[in-house]
Amino acid sequence: MRHRNGNRKLNRTSSHRAAMLRNMANSLLTHEAIVTTLPKAKELRRVVEPLITLGKKPSLANRRLAFDRTRDRDVVVKLFGDLGPRFTARNGGYVRVLKYGFRKGDNAPLALVELVDKPAAE
């Protein structure tokens, strides 16, 4: 029985799902906004929010945890240098998921995933 099983399978093996979510989290933290399907976006939010919470407390242990989860040094540097200090006053809810229409090929529902306190576009 699937009672209380929390994560979506997204029709992938566990290793593929973990790699996909890691790559999407790296893209979101790098670009601060991405477009993906709605179920992937909702699952991505569960990956990124704890990472930003780690970035708010700059310790060596937290840096190592963040690197273990992202496997990307540039993302870790941005997380602790830019994103962590930006969200110090906010207690969670760092990621916004907005519905974004439907994909042309298969009519899959799309979502725009973005960080809440994005700097103004130039």
Swiss-Prot record:
It holds the Pfam family Ribosomal_L17. GO terms for biological process: translation. The keyword Oxidoreductase does not apply. Keywords: Ribonucleoprotein, Ribosomal protein. This is Large ribosomal subunit protein bL17. PANTHER family: LARGE RIBOSOMAL SUBUNIT PROTEIN BL17M, RIBOSOMAL PROTEIN L17. It comes from Neisseria meningitidis serogroup B (strain ATCC BAA-335 / MC58). Disulfide bonds: none annotated.
